[in-house]
């Protein structure tokens, strides 16, 4: 945990881990959580401070997602986000503590609830941080499908490390290729492009001729891009 804390003190997890047991364990290790509540989560507004004796109230009225009290929250303006998003500090019954809550009302009217146990984070930071979880999952998904992450049958640690690193390195190289050439972010298209380019090169190599590249450049490009166009 000390090595991880030197990098970041935030752990991003999906809604399955939005429980007091997981949050308490992470808190004891020094980590904050950025996650998502289930749609039926019980949340309360933070009550205003009252000048009276006794213990102050921890939670106020329950948050009704169908009838939000906009005076208790701040609207977020995020480029590219469909619908509307609001942020506020709220009491979460599942975690038994106050969190930084982001309510995203999608165009269809359905709400998604994102939160962070680090109260100093802004609502925009919570959403951006949670979105990084998908980028990590996409790396594993694409590596499994296209760069052989699960294909290695070795049993030694060093051999497995090499195979895993080679898989992720190939994926990163493909993403750099996509970015440099202004292509759609699709590994399937890149794989088809590489296969067709290699197959075209193999045909010319087997024929043992050196064609005029200037004359056939257009034809080669059509051959290479034939499969994506046909799909």
Locate each region found by the language model.
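Short, basic/hydrophobic alpha-helical segments
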Residues: 1-10, 102
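Short, conserved catalytic/metal-binding motifs centered on acidic residues
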Residues: 10-18, 33, 114, 134-143, ...
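Short His-Asn-centered micro-motif
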Residues: 12-16, 35-37, 91, 104, ...
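Short, well-ordered alpha-helical microsegments
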Residues: 18-23, 123
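Short, surface-exposed basic-aromatic patches at helix termini and helix-loop junctions that form
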Residues: 22-32
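Acidic, His- and aromatic-enriched active-site or binding-groove loops in soluble protein domains
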Residues: 31-42
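A short, flexible helix-boundary coil/loop motif
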Residues: 46-102, 145-153, 158, 165-231
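Short amphipathic alpha-helical "interface-anchor" segments enriched in bulky aromatics
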Residues: 123-154
